C-alpha cells in the first residue's frame, strides 16, 4: 500500500508490537504512533476485557507475547501485568531504534485535552516525508475515567511478582 500510494503511513498496529523494528525497515515512510497511558488504567482495562469478552477473568484475552508460556502459568492479574510489561519492553526497544522521523509518542491525557497539538505533530511528520496533510481542528474531549488508587497496591504487587518470576525477552 505504501509503495503504491507513495505516501507515508500512520498506523497503530498492536499485533506488530514485537516486530516494529523489522516493519520500519520494510516501510521507511511509515510513522509509528505510541499512545502512552497510565499503566494502572491499561492493566485495569485489560483485566476487565477478559471478563467482558469471555465471562472469566482467568481466561487469556489479547495477543500472546513472546513470554506467553511463562505468563499463562501465573494468576490472572500477574498475566495481565506481564502482558503490559512485555508490550512496554518491546515498544521501548523499538522506539529507541526506529528513526525519530518515523515515530510519534503522545500521552493519552495530553491528547484528549489538546488533540490539535497532536495533529500539528502529525502534520509535521507527514511534511517531513514530502506530504502535505491538513487536519480539521477538533474540540478537546474528556479522558476516560482513570482507575483511581484503589487497585494500585494490588497491581504493584502483580508487577513485582512478574518481574521476579518471568524471564522477559532481552532485545
Q: Predicted regions span which residues?
A:
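PAPS-dependent sulfotransferases, especially Golgi type II membrane carbohydrate sulfotransferases
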Residues: 47-171
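Short, flexible loop/turn elements at secondary-structure junctions
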Residues: 14-17, 39, 110-112
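PAPS-dependent sulfotransferase catalytic domain
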Residues: 1-35
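Short, well-ordered alpha-helical microsegments
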Residues: 17-21, 43, 115
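Long, well-ordered mid-to-C-terminal structural blocks that present hydrophobic/aromatic surfaces
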Residues: 22-65
Amino acid at each position: 500500500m505504501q509503495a503504491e500510494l507513495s505516501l507515508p503511513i500512520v498506523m497503530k498496529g498492536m499485533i506488530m508490537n514485537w516486530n516494529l523494528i523489522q516493519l520500519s525497515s520494510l516501510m521507511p515512510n511509515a510513522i509509528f504512533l505510541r499512545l502512552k497511558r497510565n499503566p494502572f488504567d491499561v492493566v485495569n482495562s485489560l483485566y476487565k476485557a477478559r471478563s467482558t469478552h469471555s465471562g472469566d477473568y482467568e481466561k487469556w484475552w489479547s495477543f500472546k507475547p513472546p513470554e506467553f508460556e511463562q505468563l499463562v502459568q501465573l494468576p490472572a492479574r500477574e498475566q495481565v501485568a506481564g502482558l503490559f510489561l512485555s508490550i512496554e519492553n518491546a515498544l521501548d526497544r523499538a522506539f529507541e531504534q526506529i528513526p525519530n522521523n518515523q515515530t510519534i509518542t503522545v500521552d493519552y491525557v495530553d491528547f484528549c485535552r489538546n488533540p490539535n497539538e497532536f495533529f500539528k505533530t502529525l502534520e509535521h511528520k507527514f511534511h517531513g516525508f514530502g506530504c502535505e496533510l491538513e487536519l480539521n481542528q477538533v474540540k478537546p474531549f474528556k479522558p476516560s475515567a482513570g482507575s483511581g488508587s484503589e487497585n494500585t497496591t494490588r497491581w504493584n504487587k502483580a508487577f513485582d511478582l512478574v518481574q521476579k518470576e518471568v524471564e522477559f525477552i532481552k532485545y
